[in-house]
């Protein structure tokens, strides 16, 4: 009898937790769209990424002291060439890869302006991997996109292309340059689509 009471007690105590877990699992499996988040700009102001809806968006995690930092020049060239056609480039500084972005917001902004003439939108420093990753990057890395697929960010300058419909259409590795023909093909195809 004691065994039955104990089992009943365990079931009563555990059941709400299981049900709660199911509800939380269902909630956590809802995939948010990347442009549904509000992020801090480099100047500290909140930016609702929904303002980019209807544009083609290139999201890149960036760093000032990385071997790939010269990609800022190509990102700026893309901005210069395509911003009038509704391409938005969003740079997200990150210090998670060998501490290659140690600067303050002011230092990052100055570095980008002086060395690369950056005028595309830059955001406050974020984490892009691990438990501390911001929700935007948790969403981006959960998606199965071509050619890289889902999974953690491998290094600075990983690139995500978001179409006019707000869906991620491509993900490119850090070593794939912003002006690589594969990147340009995706961007131009998305720009050609009607809003």
Task: Show which residues each predicted segment covers.
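Sec-dependent N-terminal signal peptides
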Residues: 5-13
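C-terminal motif of bacterial Sec signal peptides marking the signal peptidase cleavage site
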Residues: 16-17
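N-terminal "domain-start" segment that seeds a small globular fold
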Residues: 21-50, 70, 135
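Amphipathic alpha-helical repeat scaffolds
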Residues: 41, 61-65
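Conserved helix-turn-beta segment immediately C-terminal to the redox Cys motif
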Residues: 55-56, 65, 69-93, 113-116
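Thiol-based oxidoreductase modules, predominantly thioredoxin-like and allied folds used
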Residues: 86-103, 119-130
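Short, internal strand/loop/helix patches
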Residues: 106-156
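Thiol-/selenol-based redox modules, centered on thioredoxin-like
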Residues: 135-138, 142-195
């Amino acid at each position: 009898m004691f065994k039955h009471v104990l089992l009943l007690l365990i079931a009563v105590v555990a059941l709400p937790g299981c049900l709660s877990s199911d509800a939380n699992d269902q909630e956590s499996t809802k995939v948010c769209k990347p442009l549904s988040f509000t992020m801090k700009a480099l100047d500290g102001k909140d930016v609702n990424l929904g303002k980019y809806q209807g544009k083609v968006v290139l999201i890149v995690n960036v760093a000032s002291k990385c071997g790939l930092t010269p990609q800022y020049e190509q990102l700026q060239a893309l901005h210069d060439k395509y911003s009038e056609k509704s391409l938005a480039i969003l740079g997200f500084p990150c210090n998670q890869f060998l501490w290659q972005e140690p600067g303050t917001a002011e230092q990052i902004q100055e570095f980008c302006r002086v060395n690369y003439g950056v005028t595309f939108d830059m955001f406050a420093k974020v984490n892009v991997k691990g438990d501390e990753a911001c929700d935007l990057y948790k969403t981006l890395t959960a998606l199965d996109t071509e050619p890289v697929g889902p999974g953690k960010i491998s290094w600075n300058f990983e690139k995500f292309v978001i179409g006019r419909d707000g869906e991620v259409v491509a993900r490119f590795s850090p070593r794939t340059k912003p002006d690589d023909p594969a990147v340009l093909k995706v961007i131009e195809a998305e720009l050609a689509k009607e809003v």
